[in-house]
């Protein structure tokens, strides 16, 4: 049985001190000059950015979102580092690769962030390094600031300006440093992207965020006085917007309309949104499963467009070389794997939150956490999906739980049975004794017995029954 972490929180009198002890250094707001530079570069390089899978991500970076520290601390109290999920009274949920795609615009496909450059790419990188060293020397700086970097490269109209812009974007809005400087560690990625090479930024961003959520949870649990400080540099705006998307009671009073061509993040930017006054801890503690939005991106928005993996009717697709990248992206989102960042590797367990993908939630397996090098972890993440048949649920499907899953959670959380009871029968499909004629199997889904047998026959434990099913030809 999964060990429940100590979720004790500071008493109310200490909450203000706690909030003053946490510094979100990675929370960056775009200034006027950055927006202007992004607009200029977009007009020149949009096709390249689309090819590299960063166009929407860069446009999202031009949107400002004000930090809500109380919300961030409240949701972080629910974090479980054993599973990289949030533990709520009624069950688990987490930030997935799907959320990173929709809210920040990063790609789950492509080469790893540590991908090597060819000879010509290394020459371009070396030019950036030399310019960085020159700026430091001329100004007697230890680091190169955004101001100095933009002064050197902005409006130069040379071939290096594009790469320099991407280096700034990566240093400030993708892999922020604690000291607000241009980080040479991103130069290789900048060169790749400038040439239209797709880099899998989503798993790297999520790996870094998981790692710092664990650090923040530990800080909250061990907090004593305001002298106990912590500095965080990852993209916690994703945590905040994820919470807004999922909990209506915590959303701003008014969201922005989605304008044509704008990224989804723009509905939460600060142009007209007003912070809702809520007791975050109380809302999360008293939340029932019905108050959680399992699939917010399946809701129709004016000027919004559904991806191919949000069909109106459920479907099965064969993964082969001709399959559209959108379906392959969904397969990566629902596959248990390792997430490779620049300086960390984190476990990814989407099987624990299958309902977030419109899939049947079964009892989750024992968590096995094995350490791998970043190369081995990437090979596992990027494992070929050939000859796999992928189930794509309807965007209209409601969340489903196996009866055994709700019973398992009751045993895991006996003190929270009341919240678990809100998993009403309409949400639960039959128990393990259901036969193949059960009418409660979601429309478009093959019979559960067949799905279960396929899973049990599969030796690849990285594919889970509630998500990706490898079907033998005799079953197709």
Model-derived segments and spans:
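Extended amphipathic alpha-helical scaffolding regions
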Residues: 153, 190-192, 230, 363-366
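Intrinsically disordered, low-complexity regions enriched in proline, serine, glycine
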Residues: 58-61, 88, 97-98, 110-113, ...
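Alpha-helical repeat scaffolds in large eukaryotic proteins
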Residues: 80, 105, 133, 137, ...
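Short linear interaction motifs
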Residues: 30, 68-69, 76-84, 147-152, ...
């Amino acid at each position: 049985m999964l060990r429940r972490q100590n979720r004790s929180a500071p008493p109310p009198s200490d909450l203000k001190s706690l909030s003053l002890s946490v510094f979100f250094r990675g929370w960056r707001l775009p200034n006027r000059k950055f927006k202007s530079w992004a607009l200029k570069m977009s007009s020149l390089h949009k096709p390249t950015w689309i090819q590299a899978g960063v166009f929407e991500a860069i446009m999202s970076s031009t949107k400002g979102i004000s930090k809500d520290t109380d919300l961030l601390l409240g949701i972080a109290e629910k974090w479980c580092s054993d599973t990289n999920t949030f533990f709520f009274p009624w069950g688990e949920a987490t930030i997935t690769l799907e959320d990173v795609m929709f809210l920040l615009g990063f790609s789950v496909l492509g080469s790893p962030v540590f991908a090597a450059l060819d000879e010509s790419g290394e020459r371009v990188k070396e030019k950036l390094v030399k310019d960085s060293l020159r700026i430091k020397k001329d100004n007697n700086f230890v680091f190169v600031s955004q101001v100095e970097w933009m002064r050197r490269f902005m409006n130069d109209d040379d071939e290096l300006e594009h790469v320099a812009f991407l280096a700034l974007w990566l240093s400030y809005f993708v892999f922020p440093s604690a000291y607000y400087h241009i980080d040479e560690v991103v130069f290789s990625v900048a060169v790749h992207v400038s040439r239209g090479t797709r880099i899998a930024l989503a798993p790297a961003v999520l790996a870094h965020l998981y790692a710092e959520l664990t650090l923040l949870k530990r800080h909250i649990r061990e907090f004593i006085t305001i002298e106990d400080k912590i500095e965080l540099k990852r993209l916690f705006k994703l945590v905040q917007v994820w919470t807004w998307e999922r909990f209506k009671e915590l959303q701003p009073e008014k969201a922005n309309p989605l304008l044509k061509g704008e990224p989804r993040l723009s509905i939460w930017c600060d142009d007209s949104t007003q912070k809702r006054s809520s007791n975050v801890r109380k809302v999360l503690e008293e939340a029932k499963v019905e108050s959680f939005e399992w699939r917010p991106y399946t809701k129709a928005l004016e000027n919004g467009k559904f991806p191919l993996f949000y069909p109106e009717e459920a479907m099965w697709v064969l993964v082969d070389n001709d399959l559209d990248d959108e379906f392959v992206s969904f397969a990566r989102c629902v596959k248990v794997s390792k997430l490779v960042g620049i300086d960390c590797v984190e476990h990814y367990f989407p099987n624990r939150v299958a309902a977030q993908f419109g899939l049947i939630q079964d009892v989750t397996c024992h968590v096995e956490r094995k350490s791998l090098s970043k190369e081995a972890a990437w090979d596992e993440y990027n494992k070929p999906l050939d000859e796999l048949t992928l189930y794509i649920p309807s965007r209209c499907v409601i969340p489903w739980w196996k009866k055994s899953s709700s019973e398992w959670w009751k045993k895991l959380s006996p003190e929270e049975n009341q919240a678990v009871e809100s998993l009403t029968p309409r949400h639960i499909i039959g128990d393990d004794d259901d036969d193949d004629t059960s009418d409660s199997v979601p429309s478009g889904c093959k019979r559960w017995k067949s799905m279960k047998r396929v899973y049990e026959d599969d030796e690849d434990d990285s594919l889970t029954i509630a998500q990706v099913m490898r079907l033998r030809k005799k079953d197709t």
